[in-house]
Amino acid sequence: MLHLLALFLHCLPLASGDYDICKSWVTTDEGPTWEFYACQPKVMRLKDYVKVKVEPSGITCGDPPERFCSHENPYLCSNECDASNPDLAHPPRLMFDKEEEGLATYWQSITWSRYPSPLEANITLSWNKTVELTDDVVMTFEYGRPTVMVLEKSLDNGRTWQPYQFYAEDCMEAFGMSARRARDMSSSSAHRVLCTEEYSRWAGSKKEKHVRFEVRDRFAIFAGPDLRNMDNLYTRLESAKGLKEFFTLTDLRMRLLRPALGGTYVQRENLYKYFYAISNIEVIGRCKCNLHANLCSMREGSLQCECEHNTTGPDCGKCKKNFRTRSWRAGSYLPLPHGSPNACATAGSFGNCECYGHSNRCSYIDFLNVVTCVSCKHNTRGQHCQHCRLGYYRNGSAELDDENVCIECNCNQIGSVHDRCNETGFCECREGAAGPKCDDCLPTHYWRQGCYPNVCDDDQLLCQNGGTCLQNQRCACPRGYTGVRCEQPRCDPADDDGGLDCDRAPGAAPRPATLLGCLLLLGLAARLGR
């Protein structure tokens, strides 16, 4: 009977844009089967599942007992905070309790009695689960809102933090930022972090209590002021980079940096009126299940998705065993109105194993949670055989499933650094080499089983003394000259006695040794003539 009831509920008509049904029993030509849809859990009050932590230790009032007063009656300090007295204590849990009408219960910090040392507090809300905000975060302060505050979020259970929104009565002075309002942002800036002055200026502690992180104003940029065009919002959540992730978190942290001052400067004569007091923190959202579940419940002390589509894990972030023929993928809101489930599939559900026809075998890598192709053919490689092997490049005129999708680089072994090339087929050349395959030389080099710098040319490396440059490799020097570029006179043996005859070009000055020999001969001839 219960099985029939469950089947009946799954067969109810699908509500457009709600994404509240994960599967439906349908009849096909091959018989009845389940049809899957993208789905998500219902919105809930996340504060009912939160764990709160207040830092630093000793920031909560009452230990030891302490007097305090309000800004309205700053000199009537008859109020007392005493942690040992339940009627006078203000522990952190009172930020999330159910209050009777007309009676506010609240957490309260110590007063600023140690001024000028800063009065700062961190309030961390943790869910140990990835959640998505669907409405404004509303923080209610008794006795005045902080004049400086930062709201931060974490995506990794509090290991790292990033700013979510800045709050100050003067944004430029506090954070060096211009003040902005969420309602004035554009579609391209809806996920940017801003500083607002809207919730920090003094308006009387009993008049303005709320501090907001505006989710609805950001949604309204896409869905309209009444949030009626949800189809457009879902479309933008899928298509706008970073938008969906902006509303996703595991933890929130309020960094209270300066308390309410009552619209004036700090008055040193009465520091008991400066403190923080929070009566409520409202967080509306849903479990993030990657559009693979419509139910989320407390199990083993934390929220967990009740996964469909053959997925598993706290966020339905993995495929079940025996359903790993293809890599896990999150569901999608598109196409409207039911989205794409991207369900994990059993073995044999996909004949080509998503390898573009270059392999018919796949393997599941557990620690990476991916399915990868094995033994890619046609010189391909990669998770889906979508890349070319080293030494090959993509054929731009061929489709990914073409056997000739990868072309060999054919780099010249001597002129190239290695046998690999870039995506256009150009090889990495050694010094002096050029050309797509490195089989040519730069104009300043010549080829001889590799590229070598020119010895001579007709431009800058000229052969001297009438020499002729032969193929940029050497200078052919005229009689009487030698050297790389014919820059040195040549000396040859002159007789059998080992003397040297240094030829010189016409008009060249005689060498000193030759001149000395001539003088000696002239002297000898003069003596003989006597």
Swiss-Prot record:
Disulfide bridge positions per record: 22-39, 61-81, 69-77, 171-195, 287-296, 289-305, 307-316, 319-344, 353-362, 355-373, 376-385, 388-406, 409-421, 411-427, 429-438, 441-451, 456-469, 463-475, 477-486
Domain Laminin EGF-like: 287-346, 353-408, 409-453
Membrane topology qualifier: Lipid-anchor; GPI-anchor
Glycosylated residues (UniProt): 122, 128, 310, 395, 422
Lipidated sites in chain (GPI-anchor amidated glycine): 507
Protein location: Cell membrane
Segments of this protein annotated with the region NGL discriminant loop I: 69-88
UniProt cross-references to InterPro entries, sorted A to Z: EGF-like_dom (IPR000742), Laminin/Netrin_ECM (IPR050440), Laminin_N (IPR008211), LE_dom (IPR002049), LMN_ATRN_NET-like_EGF (IPR056863)
Extent of the signal sequence: 1-17
GO cellular component terms listed in the entry, alphabetical order: axon; extracellular region; glutamatergic synapse; plasma membrane; presynaptic active zone membrane; Schaffer collateral - CA1 synapse; side of membrane
Residue span(s) of the pro-peptide: 508-530
Laminin N-terminal domain span: 35-286
Biological process terms in GO annotation: axonogenesis; modulation of chemical synaptic transmission; postsynaptic specialization assembly; regulation of neuron migration; regulation of neuron projection arborization; regulation of neuron projection development; regulation of presynapse assembly; synaptic membrane adhesion
Positions of the UniProt region annotated as NGL discriminant loop II: 201-203
Free-text description of this protein's post-translational modifications in UniProt: N-glycosylated.
Short name of any one Pfam family annotated for the protein: EGF_laminin
Impact reported for residue 107 to G: In NEDBASH; abolished cell surface expression
Outcome of substituting residue 355 to W: In NEDBASH; highly decreased cell surface expression
Disease: Neurodevelopmental disorder with behavioral abnormalities, absent speech, and hypotonia: An autosomal recessive disorder characterized by global developmental delay with severely impaired intellectual development, impaired motor development, axial and peripheral hypotonia, poor speech and significant behavioral abnormalities, including autism spectrum disorder, hyperactivity, mood disorders, aggression, hand and face stereotypies, sleep disturbances, anxiety, self-injurious behavior, and bruxism.
Function according to Swiss-Prot or TrEMBL: Involved in controlling patterning and neuronal circuit formation at the laminar, cellular, subcellular and synaptic levels. Promotes neurite outgrowth of both axons and dendrites.
Domain remark in the UniProt entry: The laminin N-terminal domain mediates 1:1 binding to NGL ligand with sub-micromolar affinity. Three NGL-binding loops mediate discrimination for LRRC4C/NGL1 among other NGLs by binding specifically to its LRR repeats. This specificity drives the sorting of a mixed population of molecules into discrete cell surface subdomains.
Known partners and oligomeric status: Interacts with LRRC4.
This protein's name: Netrin-G2
Provenance organism: Homo sapiens (Human)
Lineage, uppermost ranks: Eukaryota, Metazoa, Chordata, Craniata, Vertebrata
Gene: NTNG2
